[in-house]
């Protein structure tokens, strides 16, 4: 098992070489610090405590500050244990590149809070009849149905009734890792992820152990836009553009052609 802590940035879409638009969630994964190593002998189970995102020292108490000093780091905002994650030492950093492109992961977060909701929205119950006497009064169309047998003389726990919706732990399984950006500390996973923007999430290797998918070859949209602009300039200056040419290769040729054109104008 391996895992890492991060923060949901939001959703966007990227493009593959075949032109397919892939909806992805961007997760900011700054270097996680191992702030505690739990062993079976001392704690009864094996786990690693990860911490990420700095917190002001005045907002942490002395025991908390001392705990982070043992790992030679500053107080952190987001702290979680990842079970059965072996091979790490106290104070060691865990980077986003522990996951690879095509790997399947489980992402856990806190779902968006919806406040007080009825049984139709909360449990997807069927709406009541809108005609034949079901439009209101004693039979409103959004009212809950039966709450149990009359012989029970009470409402049993667990009945589907109105109440608070959302703001609870939710996990989406088998999300594909589309891109790993070590330079910007970003992880892009295919599809949506529980929680609002800037909410904390936990990314773990998939529990179901399904095989990884083939890495998708992505297109750099900025590079494509830049190349289109350079190709138009190249046509005007009669610069030869070869198939598969990169902008770094084409730009010097265009600059050289522009200098030659400027010299010709001066000579005239």
From Swiss-Prot:
User: What's in the GO CC field?
Assistant: cytosolic large ribosomal subunit
Q: Which InterPro entries match?
A: Ribosomal_uL3, Ribosomal_uL3_bac/org-type, Ribosomal_uL3_CS, Transl_B-barrel_sf
The answer to whether the entry has keyword rRNA-binding is yes
Keyword Secreted belongs to the record: no
Lineage, top-rank taxon, reads Bacteria
Per the record, the coiled-coil ranges are none
Alphabetically ordered keywords of this record: Ribonucleoprotein, Ribosomal protein, RNA-binding, rRNA-binding
Q: Which GO terms describe its molecular function?
A: rRNA binding; structural constituent of ribosome
Q: Which Pfam families match?
A: Ribosomal_L3 (PF00297)
Q: Where is the signal peptide?
A: none
In the record, biological process GO terms are: translation
Describe its assembly. Part of the 50S ribosomal subunit. Forms a cluster with proteins L14 and L19.
Q: What job does this protein perform? A: One of the primary rRNA binding proteins, it binds directly near the 3'-end of the 23S rRNA, where it nucleates assembly of the 50S subunit.
> Can you tell me which family this protein belongs to?
Belongs to the universal ribosomal protein uL3 family.
Protein name, please? Answer: Large ribosomal subunit protein uL3
